Amino acid sequence: MAALDVDALLVRFRERAAAVRKRPLPPVAGEERRAFIEQANQDFMDFAMVGDAQATLEDGVLVLRIDLRPADQRG
């Protein structure tokens, strides 16, 4: 198995978050449109949080540290 490049992994998640924001809205209306937008928002949040994480490998375990405090309260 190839070595895990944690920094590259985080970059890919940041790129995925950006791609979700640029994703065009398909030609749907009503409930389908609402569901698509809701899913896109959830996808963005998930990818962005992982992309912003501090990652370490500890004894073979990938640890992602995600600071959920407001930006003005981070250390």
Give the location of each predicted region.
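Compositionally biased, non-globular sequence tracts
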Residues: 1-75
